[in-house]
Every structure is written in C-alpha cells, then in structure tokens.
Amino acid sequence: QSGFTGGAINAITKSGTNEFHGSVYSYFQNGDMVSNKYEKHDGSESADYGDMTDWTLGATLGGPIVKDKLFFFANFERSKKEYDNAFSTNNGMSKIDFGVANQILDKVRTDAAAQGVTYRGTLGTPKEYTYSDKVGLKLDWNINDRNHASLRWSFVDAKQNNKTATAKNLVTNDYAFDFCSKTSALVFELNSRIGDNMSNEFHASWTSVRDKRNPGDPFPMIQISNVGGGTLCIGNERSSMANALDQDIYTLTDNFTINAGRHAITLGTHEEFYKFGNLFCQDLYGTYEFSNPTDFFAGNINRFRYGQAVESVAGTKNWTPKFSAGQFGFYVQDKWAVTDNFDLTYGLRADMPIMFDTPLENGEFNVYAAQKGWNLKTNQKIAVKPMWSPRLGFRWNTLKHNSLIVRGGVGVFTGRVPFVWISNNFSNTGVAQFSYNTYNTDGITVQYNANNAYKADPTVNPTTPAQKLQTINAFDKDFKFSQQLRANLAVDFKLLGTNWTVEGIYSKTLNDMIVKNYNVIETGKTFAQAQGLADFGDVRPMFKRGDYSGIYVLENVSKGYSYSASVKAEKSFDFGLDLMASYTYGLSKTINNGSSSVVASNWQYNYTHGNPNSPELAKSNFNIPHQVMVSAYQHINWNHNPGRTIDNKTTIGLIYTGNSGSPYSIYVNGDLNGDGGYNDLMYIPTDAEVDAMVAKGLFVPVTNKKTGAVTKTPEQQGEDFKQWLSSEKYVKNHRGQYFERNCDNEDWENRLDLHVDHKFGFKWGKDIRYIQIGLDIINFTKMLNKKWGATLSQGGFNYYSPLSYGSMKVYKVNNAGAVVESKKTGYQFTNKGSYDMRSYSDYYSRWRMQLTAKLTF
C-alpha cells in the first residue's frame, strides 16, 4: 500500500445475499438534551447553550437480483445539524465590545451607501449548521466459480457554514460562508482465480469532488482589532471571495499473486491520475485591516491587501488555474511461511510522481532569482524521480496456540503532497494573477463597491503584473513527496485469563514539507542589539523584507520524528461483562505542521523564535503525550431459556477517557523580528530583564484618546507583567528562555460517557426482526459534577498573546491644550497581572444526550 505516511483506512462495504435484508435507523439530539450551563475553572458559569437540533435518518436494503448470481445493496442517509452560536450575542461569552461593534457596523453601512452600495450584513452568525445526504449502491456478480466482480457507486452532497463567531472573533453573517461539497465515486473490482496457484485482483475507480465556498454579496473584508478583547470582521472572508476546487481522480490497481509452496509472491501496479481546477483569489474585493476602532473611524488603514487575475492574460478576474498530475507505483512482495508459526513478509515498492502541466513563466522573476543565486523558476516542475519504499514485516506465533505472538516490521512509506499547495504555484506566478500586500496605505481609502476594489497608483502600487511587490510561489528543483521511515514491535499474549497487547511505534521523517520565504533577509543584528539591551536573552535574528510581497518556496526537510508506546488489556466474563483498559504515551515533533491549504499561511503561522526559514524542531500541533482509556460493558440477556434464538438483550457501558490537554503556544502580538510574519514566540524574561526593558523605555504608556491622560504607565505594565510571569504554571519555571512551540499542554481532561441500549427480536411471518433502542450520555462526567468535564479546544491547539509589540498610538495634551497623537514602537501589557489562558470548547464542555433507534429486517 502507498499514498499515506500516517494511517490508512481499509473499508469493507456490505453486499447483498440470496435473502432480502435491510434496516432503518435514526440518531437524534436537541437543545433539551444538552446541559444549559457549565462551570469554568475560575468558578464562573458559561452562558446558556441555546437551541439546537441534530438528527440522522438512514436506511439500507440488500438482496438478490438473480439468485446465487447477481446481488445488490443500497443505502441512504440524511443528516441535519443546526445550533445557536453562543458568541454571536452579547451574553458574556464573547470578549467583543458589542457597543463599539455596532457603531462600526453603522459607519460601514453609511460609508457604503455613500458609494452606492447597500450593505445587508448583520452582526453575528446566529445559526450554525451542517447538512448532508449520502447515497450508495453496490452490485455483486458471481460470474463463475473463478471470477467475481463488483461495482460500487456513492454520492455525498454536503453543506456547512464556516468562519463563524468565536470568543475572540465576532463576524458578520456574510463573513461566515457556506462550504458546499459534492463527491461522487465509482469503483469496479474483478477478483479472479487462475489455475490452482494463481490469482489476480483488478481495481479501477473514478472520484469526482466539487468544493465551493459561497460567500454573501460581493463586499470587501474589513477587519478591526482591539474591539474590546477581540477582533471584528465585516464583509466577505478574504480567502472565500473566489474559492472553488474541482478534482477528478482516476486509479488503476492490479495485483497478480503466485502461490509457490510456502511463498505467496505478489507483483502489482497502482496508477493514479489527477485533474484539478482551483479557483482561488484572495482579497478579490480588497481586505482592509485596522489596528483598533479609533483608526477605523479616522480612516487610518494599517494594512491593505488585494488580488485578482490579469484579464489580458487569463481572460477573467475569476481565473481558475488547471493542471494534471499522476503517480505511478510498481511493487513486488513475498509472503513467506518460513515455518508453521513464523511468517516473513518483505517487498519493494517504487512510486514516481509526475506533473503533466507547467506553471506559467515569469521571465522577470526568473532573471531576478538567477541574479540572487537561487535555483528557482516559476515554470519549474517537480523532478520525475522514483521514490523507493522497501519494507519488512514478521509474525511469530511462538507457542503455536496464539497465547504469545510477537509481530513487527520496518519500512518506508511514501505519501502525497496536498495538491492544493501545488495549485498555489500555478496561481501565484505573478503573470496571470497578482496580489498586493502593503502597509504603505497613504492615499488608500476603503472601496465598498467590489468593482472598484483596486485603483492602480504608481506611487503606491505597481501597475503591471511583472513588476515587483508580487506574491510568488515556486518549487525547489529537488522537491519530493513526503516519506516516512516507520518501525513497530508488538507482543500479544494471554496472562491470567486476560488478553494483553504491548506495542511500540517509531517514525522518522525522511522527506517532509517546509515553506521558506526567500523575500525575508537577515540584517545581521539580534533583537537585543536592535533594542540596545546589552544583557537581554532575546537574541532572535532580525530581518528586512526584499523586493516582493513574498516568495514562498516549497522545499523538503528531513527533521522530525514521532513515537508511541501503548499497553492494552481486555477480559471477558461468562456473565456478560467485557472490560478494557489501555494507556498510550507518545511524542511527535515536526518542523512545520502544514495545517493550512495556503502555502503562505504555512510559513506565516508556523510560530518560531528564530529564523522563520529554518524553524526549530518542536512538538506537533496535535501532540497529546498521555491518554488513558477504560471501558466496561455489561450485557444482560433476558432470555432465561438458553434454547431461544430471539435476542432480548440490554447493554450498559461506561467509557472513560483521560488525556493531556491540547498543546498551546505563547507568542507576542506583533512583528518582533521584522519578517512580516507576526509569528514570534515569546521570550520569557527574568524580573531583572523586565526592569531593564522598562528603564530602556521599551514599554509604551497606555493613554486615553479623548483626554490624553495616562491610564497605565510603563512602570505599572512592567510590574503587572512580572506578576503574570511569576504566576503562570509553565512560564514561571522557564524564565530567561523562549516559549518553544507547543512545549506545554493544557490541563489534564477527564471524560466519562454512558451508553445504554436494548435489543429485542420478534417474529414477522417466518422471519425475525430486531428493534434496538439506545441512549448515549456523552460527557456524563459533567452531569455527575458541574466542576468536571470541561474541555479546552477539542481536537485542536491554542495560541495566546498576553504581550503586544508594535507601533503604538500615544495621546497627550500639547501646550495649546489640545490632545495630539504620536506613535512609539514598543511593548504594551494591558492586563492586570493576570491573563486568561483557557479557551473553552463550549459544546464539548457540556453533557449531552443522544437517542438512537434501529429496525433490522
């Protein structure tokens, strides 16, 4: 197998038989089945949950078309989930100042109307929703005794709204776009026996994916920071103004196996062909960023971004780059039964990725890159080279009766690169599509009419796509698909009537993705030197930006590894009790998590305290070091007559999960090192270093815009900062060090779930039907005690920024008695010696019930 470096899922679909069988099932949950409030760590309570509905209805049917020859199996499922967004109203959950937010929205409407535009957006995203329909059909054909064929078709139609309001981000309803996805798949399989010792498996498939974002009316994105304790976003989300992805994927697989004595030799090939069309034009209607509400009302734009296709080249502003690629795989494997109780499997696989199309040539950039000594061209493709994957595995049934099995293996696994990254190279050549990103906003005003989003001004922005200030994406000439070396060793054994498994897994990165921005250049100074601090531990390198907005290059890195060790015990009793307990310890370190579909974002949001083009190896965004699972299921059979064949059984289960909290990082809100990335991890200063920062004038006073009065002096900020540094659990023990990316985890989390179901059968004619009714209470822990079961960022990771750095506005009264404004670069710590570093997952921190019902016939 290939195409993955993490885990692979092999699914077996149901088939029809000579008898008609089917099922109807449903899952249901509403707002009355979710706890109204939950208690936080500080004793405060959450807001009411609000209304919600979550249901799924499905049906299956299978049976014969021609008895013993041709069968069918069909399924349908519809799901609908709607719930209130807790952060869209002024209920205390949001950190946004709703009064100021409404004033901003009123001004947007007024200014837009003055330009002939009616803005219909409203604050908040009251309803969140996910809808989906799933349909499937499978045909099985017993051609003859030696040949079996199947044809499988599936279709999924889904819609979900995204970018909705959070605790620190309030958005308008048109900012929260609909993500619509339609997926069709057709799979044909033919399994054949050839003679007495040979067989062949043939597999062909086609998958079509049509993804599209549907924003509101065309409107620029207006982003205002520091609206209370968060950010307000109005209009279309910048990455969704023009965003659609079409994918067609074709695969062919053939495995020919020869059984020769103790050897089963497989020769095979797996071919993949891809066709992509990716409409992606960020900032098509313009994106205007303001540092605070005061700047917004004054029209002081902090940052302006704009992008569109060059109509003279692409023919339209909404240009869809298209390209095709493939990956050809060939392999040989031998499964050797060395003895009756020892199997050895070994083989070799070669994969060859290939791109059939070439990005457009940007001659000016290619010359520029050559002058810089870079081996880069916009019209450069991935080199066609085989990627080898040798593998070896074994299974040793040591005592020949399955009471002690040792198994393991080692090998190389070749994956793919998300092709949406490759599509960036076709979009961002600086020829057919251009983008601007500037902090030099003099003369720029907000254009609310989407057709007037950009007006070329040679003194501010270039007028031709070949000029600089462009965003360029390119490949390193030796860029490879991802590869991992992986090894595992496990022991399965029985002891005291209990089944045990002990397993260890280790993975080492051979090729992984890293994004470098060639447009940032080291100045030769450190941050401490730039600030004039002689004995200051923050010695991160300083940068300046080059001639382009960004030059993002996909390269490979071999740093990174992960390992895990686990132990699991399972025991079943004759009276119907099943017990399971497991513990897993793991560690995962990466250079870049690659969690964004935009290549530039994978550079910008890869937090570092050093060179962003050579980031330090750090814990993964998804590193959960400890996990404990315990389950107990009691099955009660109410049939006292053992001879009865109709089930009448109740199952009661308790499932406990305990794990380390989500990883988190602390960064400085600003651009410390001048690279434009805003991704600088915080240096944790000592008290003496904080005092030196204050003495050097690096803290900027907080002042009142109306009166010019100082509301928080640099000295007060320094004292409050020291108080926070001495009280935060991780920070206080790492003074004089950098906060490494994801170096700490949130508090340990405990969750107990309860499951109850009853299954009973009844006769309908000659057949037996079954009805199963179930109730799940998820996070039952919270129902037992309101102080338990809180969850921080379920399944994700957190970033916190208690300290700000940048060009701060300072107001003071001049000699004439007027309040005047000036700017000073430095730090501000506006908290009062404390900073809340807990971001609760509102839904997952509540107990919730789910009802299930299923009829089988």
What are these regions (language model features)?
Residues 501-661:
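Gram-negative outer-membrane beta-barrel transporters
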Residues 1-2, 16-21, 66-69, 146, ...:
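Short loop/turn motifs that connect adjacent beta-strands in outer-membrane beta-barrel proteins
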Residues 5-7, 55-59, 133-137, 182-188, ...:
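Hydrophobic, lipid-facing positions within transmembrane beta-strands of outer-membrane proteins
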Residues 24-30, 74-78, 151-155, 202-208, ...:
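Transmembrane beta-barrel strands of outer-membrane/channel proteins
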Residues 649-767, 772, 794-837:
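Extracytoplasmic gating/loop element in the C-terminal half of outer-membrane beta-barrel translocons
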Residues 361-389, 394-555, 695, 747, ...:
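Solvent-exposed loop/turn elements at secondary-structure boundaries
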Residues 3-8, 14-182, 196, 208-214, ...:
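Acidic, glycine-rich flexible loop segments
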